[in-house]
């Protein structure tokens, strides 16, 4: 999706967000549901990410993700419906409800809505 030099990357790792600058020590981390941000020429760009791995090397970051969507690619209405459905599942009294799955769906929908709201990010963000 992005194959160009960036000044900084913020990765949604399994144990929290990881900031990566050029020259970072090598590592591999598992991705969680979250917002990936990166800066090019003073402009911030955002992706909604879910599940996968990131390989960080001093001169390159490689992301292998199951889901990656740019802000402008996100269907906001679909994300709103997914959020409502997940909230209904979480408030359900049905003993067959998979609460962990509903929480993941809610988090993913919220991230998608947050990222979609950042379309056309301004310089310096």
Q: What is each of the regions a protein language model found here?
A:
Residues 68-125:
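Acidic/glycine-rich phosphate/pyrophosphate-binding loops and surrounding catalytic core
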Residues 1-81:
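Compact, glycine-rich, soluble single-domain proteins
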């Amino acid at each position: 999706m992005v194959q160009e030099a960036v000044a900084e990357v913020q990765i949604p790792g399994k144990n929290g967000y990881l900031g990566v600058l050029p020259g970072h020590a090598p590592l591999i981390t598992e991705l969680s549901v979250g917002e990936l941000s990166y800066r090019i020429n003073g402009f911030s760009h955002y992706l909604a990410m879910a599940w996968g791995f990131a390989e960080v090397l001093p001169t390159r970051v490689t992301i292998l993700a199951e889901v990656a969507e740019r802000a402008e690619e996100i269907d906001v209405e679909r994300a709103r419906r997914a959020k409502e459905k997940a909230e209904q599942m979480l408030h359900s009294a049905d003993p067959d409800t998979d609460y962990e799955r509903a929480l993941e769906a809610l988090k993913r929908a919220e991230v998608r809505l947050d990222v979609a709201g950042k379309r056309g990010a301004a310089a310096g963000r």
